[in-house]
Amino acid sequence: MAPPSEETPLISQRSCSLSSSEAGALHVLLPPRGPGPPQRLSFSFGDYLAEDLCVRAAKACGILPVYHSLFALATEDLSCWFPPSHIFSIEDVDTQVLVYRLRFYFPGWFGLETCHRFGLHKDLTSAILDVHVLEHLFAQHRSDLVSGRLPVGLSLKDQGEFLSLAVLDLAQMARKQAQRPGELLKSVSYKACLPPSLRDLIQGQSFVTRRRIRRTVVQALRRVVACQADRYALMAKYILDLERLHPAATTESFLVGLPGAQEEPGCLRVTGDNGIAWSSKDQELFQTFCDFPEIVDVSIKQAPRVGPAGEHRLVTITRMDGHILEAEFPGLPEALSFVALVDGYFRLICDSRHFFCKEVAPPRLLEEEAELCHGPITLDFAIHKLKAAGSLPGSYILRRSPQDYDSFLLTACVQTPLGPDYKGCLIRQDPSGAFSLVGLSQLHRSLQELLTACWHSGLQVDGTALNLTSCCVPRPKEKSNLIVVRRGRNPTPAPGHSPSCCALTKLSFHTIPADSLEWHENLGHGSFTKIFHGHRREVVDGETHDTEVLLKVMDSRHQNCMESFLEAASLMSQVSYPHLVLLHGVCMAGDSIMVQEFVYLGAIDTYLRKRGHLVPASWKLQVTKQLAYALNYLEDKGLPHGNVSARKVLLAREGVDGNPPFIKLSDPGVSPTVLSLEMLTDRIPWVAPECLQEAGTLNLEADKWGFGATTWEVFSGAPMHITSLEPAKKLKFYEDRGQLPALKWTELEGLIAQCMAYDPGRRPSFRAILRDLNGLITSDYELLSDPTPGIPNPRDELCGGAQLYACQDPAIFEERHLKYISLLGKGNFGSVELCRYDPLGDNTGPLVAVKQLQHSGPEQQRDFQREIQILKALHCDFIVKYRGVSYGPGRQSLRLVMEYLPSGCLRDFLQRHRARLHNDRLLLFAWQICKGMEYLGARRCVHRDLAARNILVESEAHVKIADFGLAKLLPLGKDYYVVREPGQSPIFWYAPESLSDNIFSRQSDVWSFGVVLYELFTYSDKSCSPSTEFLRMMGPEREGSPLCHLLELLAEGRRLPPPSTCPTEVQELMQLCWSPNPQDRPAFDTLSPQLDALWRGSPG
């Protein structure tokens, strides 16, 4: 065969050529590893699962099981991808051609400082991909480029970039074939490594020009080959450079119909590092809807209209805060392609055990669920989990082999004279699907059948007897080597962390004065409280706000439960969710009084008793689903409720006139951890059995049990017989592992049984519960039905009529529907209030933070509008989220609506929780603030007011930059901004050039960041705040302006003193941030990896 000519591409234009004799076959194409047509796998008549075909292709390419989830099958033109559950049916006349490709991308994924797989410790992380995946990805990218699949530009800059890629391509060939550049170029042309359009352009040049270009390429090739980089480093460089030139190569876009866009199509874009974004047809700019961890559930329903390709499908994505995105796809294949993409990213980033829809569930994952088997986790994670479970002799883990698709591994704990040890057995699966232990010939139909046989017959491994006793089953959200940690994202805590029931609740709540409360009628009694109807009056700026409230008074006879009662109040004051009751605060005058919002229709157990059979199953299902949303929110926060029952579920809206019902979960009250056995027995069957067996403990799994019992309670329509039993019989019910009577809705039986499993480890996550509830009702038919419904079947929504679609832009909040709740903060220029946006007038709308100006002259209005435009354009995990705006009559006034973060500002948070915030958490906060500032700098935004008071706390592991009232956008072509009228300024946070010349830049923000580091490591202690320290340096007898004295101090080299507990490395970063010359200060993109490295190296 003659060597390729100058015009011969390494990849042929057609992927393959199929003759008529190949009819009735399925071909899976693999990316070519060199010149010639791609390798392909062919399959004859029959049915084939997409995931099974992927496994066959992975074996052919040397892709290990750990990396299997990065790949998928697509049509040859990449117009449609197939979910793992898709079945290909090959008949006599059919010929189908598919491509096996890497679908899930993480840009910048080389190097552990960018993206990596989760490790047990910060120094035990691993790369996302190995050399076989690297080779596959390189071949895939190179094939796309030289075949013309990627659109390319032909500017001089672009030509230089693609010639550089050709040099890298040729260099890796030289490494692979152990050839010198001259020898290689005798058989391969550099033009064969270029996109077709550039190849044609060069071919059309004069001989002299072609000769000059070739000489340049040869010289560059010799320099690259002479360096020490190996072939894999060259391939990695090629991939990163190509993804930099063509970011679209790592994204997928879908044309869809969006609500409010009429007939105009919109576009959804999915990327591994940013999640889901959307854009309408007339907008080029994409707006972020959510990142993958924010997704609660995804559903596919039949859309009302029919298109040319068949029935349209409506995909609904629900975000953690209750907002939804609805997109209409032209057909089921397109909808499944999109959902499978989101589903796959969620498993890679958040939870390797979860799937959103059964239509796209990987069959191997379903098999693992049925067999109580883990995925291909490494031995380190298996042993770690056994240790976390107590290293009990006989405990074991079943997992897929990380090396072989047809093998499973049994890792068990045994007791030896030297202590616990861990032994392993290899289990093989033959082509028929039967299982056998290596060394034993007996076959078994399932893994569980094999393990049962082992329990009866016993096992010997290395001369040690294995007596299997208890299985450590997979749990939702477990961290392992299957999880990818992305760059610039919140680092995840180590696996095995047991959430504390008081993770956020160190008695932090708003105190309400007794004289602001007005008492009305008594509404009854709780287990430990007396309950009253009342009003709260608050005067702000001369205006009186009157709010209807519920008053819960702690009974003086239960003083021993007072701390638990206040912990419940503290928990509710630090969470914000539509389906959780709002706590206004606590009044400590005499008795402890919890002041909550008043929910008019009361508890749903009472409501259901009143309405009886008139309440349809569809109504009950929506109420149950809303309760699951609330508990999922708490689960994601790591906060167990501990007292889930129908009497704790309050009905805010009945659900008539086409609006769905709306519920709110009330506070947990006194925790089961402090209750006596007699009181716990009285709570059967809502209290989880383990709460009785292990007094003083409360885990998230207990809420799953309570949810199951509450679901039974809502649907049964009859009293629970068990509640009338004697205490001894109640306990016997649990001892005998009794079950509640069967409901007439058999569809719910399986879900309730899973939630009320006596083994807490086998209860599903609330995301999985929501998925199963979604499966009970579709738009095609109703599975749950009542013969005599009394209430109209409303549309299935999370937050009802107050729901805001993500694609409304700008979001306009009607002023009349913003209900004042309390004052969050007040400054020289404006105030921020907590409001509920409640267009239906029934207290079911979301909580929001609303900023308004104190003085609204024309200049202040312009500055405020600028602040709004800046915040509106920002989409970052570490910057407070813009929600919308609200206009007064005639648009004479303007208010900014933002997300509400109940934990308040970082300054106050540090002061409150100093005792439990160690250096590792402070470094995490510092890194997050730095990443937020890096994001701002990349968008030419200078904050000008960076301080701990202007950073909000979302959770104990997440902070966000807020207050953009002084922010400025740098003019194009300039790196600084001169403020003409500085007004009142936070001078003790300002850089010298800002104080003397009103010059602000990214470098001046770096100076302020150094002060924030100081605030972090002094815990914002007032006695050593920046202002206190500088004023102390100035001395008591100072005269004149503090600004002049401060400038003199800084010019003399005086700086804030190093905090006593601050690591030396952080002190050095502070001093660099406070360099007098702005050019000597490190940039945020330099500080970020340094802080990340310090966080990873810190204990804890």
From Swiss-Prot:
Subcellular location: Endomembrane system; Cytoplasm
Known tissue expression: In contrast with the ubiquitous expression of the other JAKs, JAK3 is predominantly expressed in hematopoietic tissues.
EC numbers: 2.7.10.2
Binding site for ATP: L824, G825, K826, G827, N828, F829, G830, S831, V832, K851
InterPro entries xrefs: Band_41_domain, FERM_domain, FERM_F1, FERM_F2, JAK, JAK1-3/TYK2_PHL_dom, Kinase-like_dom_sf, PH-like_dom_sf
GO cellular component terms listed in the entry, alphabetical order: cytoskeleton; cytosol; endomembrane system; extrinsic component of cytoplasmic side of plasma membrane
Modified residues (Phosphotyrosine): Y781, Y900, Y935, Y976, Y977
Keyword ATP-binding set for record: yes
Residues of the Protein kinase domain: 517-777, 818-1091
Assembly and interaction partners: Interacts with STAM2 and MYO18A. Interacts with SHB. Interacts with CD69.
PANTHER family: TYROSINE-PROTEIN KINASE HOPSCOTCH, TYROSINE-PROTEIN KINASE JAK3
Protein family: Belongs to the protein kinase superfamily. Tyr protein kinase family. JAK subfamily.
UniProt comment concerning the protein's domains: Possesses two phosphotransferase domains. The second one contains the catalytic domain, while the presence of a pseudokinase domain is required for suppression of basal activity of JAK3.
Name this polypeptide is given: Tyrosine-protein kinase JAK3
Protein's organism: Rattus norvegicus (Rat)
